[in-house]
Regions:
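Non-core capping and flanking segments associated with repeat-based/extracellular domains
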Residues: 1-263
Length: 263
């Protein structure tokens, strides 16, 4: 029995090509786009990419997660000191999820290059999720933030964490909040080491959650203007709280706030 003939996808009308692309998972689309300049240009022309979501994670290993129309693809970049493993790829399927591991000497650099290509193919300027543990790649935090500043117009939901209390990430936190635009949600779960910590807090968020908010005193609270505000471990006194509530009720301050929780 002779092998099947290659399917001439590029000879199809564009609408038919687009239907073929809709049946592909995001990795298949990216792999197709890498074949030639022509396939790359065709890959960038699809009209349904607005339904795709792109998420970035920097925890134990950097990750790019792509939510397609049917499948969710996660690409992990795993640091390796084994020369034989450098560049190797492992893929596993689990239901709707496709897990892709890429072994690299410099996972952050590879993660950046792969992300730029993903953004180009799917014609994205903003990303849906950024989740970052600031104590994982401390020496590269500034480089990562500068990269995001140059390549991402905005982030819809951002979560920042600190796993090692002994590592001071105050400056990195402030630098990220000064340079990355956050549209909808900010979750901040880190320890504060400096009394003068005073980062920019985005305005008009749908939700602001700060789990160690000792640095947010009364005057700073008056500046917060988000729809839902949750502040844990907060030092505001009962007297200040009562004054704030009175101002809030008569709409003298924080007019966008609909829900406020202090602990």
């Amino acid at each position: 029995m002779s092998p099947p003939k290659p399917f001439p996808i590029l000879r199809l009308p564009f609408l038919a090509i687009e239907e073929v692309f809709k049946a592909m998972d995001p990795i298949e689309i990216i792999n197709f786009s890498m074949i030639s300049k022509r396939t790359k240009e065709i890959g960038k022309r699809m009209s349904f990419y607005s339904n795709y979501a792109i998420e970035l994670y920097v925890h134990e290993m950097p990750e790019i997660r792509l939510h397609g129309t049917k499948d969710v693809v996660s690409s992990f970049y795993v640091m390796t000191s084994d020369k034989e493993m450098d560049g190797k790829i492992e893929e596993k399927e689990w239901g709707r999820y496709i897990i892709r591991k890429v072994f690299k000497y410099d996972p952050i650099d590879e993660w950046k290059q792969w992300f730029k290509y993903v953004m180009e193919i799917f014609r994205k300027q903003a990303i849906d999720v950024l989740t970052m543990t600031l104590t994982t790649f401390v020496d590269q935090n500034v480089s990562i933030i500068d990269f995001l500043k140059s390549n991402v117009k905005s982030v819809d939901r951002c979560s920042l964490y600190q796993r090692d209390e002994q590592i001071n990430v105050d400056k990195h936190t402030a630098y990220l909040l000064d340079n990355v635009k956050i549209n909808s949600e900010l979750c901040y779960d880190a320890y504060i080491n400096n009394d003068d910590f005073n980062p920019k807090i985005p305005k008009s968020l749908q939700e602001l959650r700060i789990y160690n908010s000792k640095w947010i005193e009364y005057e700073r609270l008056l500046e917060i203007d988000c729809k839902s505000v949750i502040l844990k471990n907060n030092p505001i006194s009962n007297k200040e709280w009562n004054v704030f509530v009175k101002k809030w009720r008569v709409m003298e301050t924080n007019q966008n706030v609909e829900y406020l929780e202090l602990d």
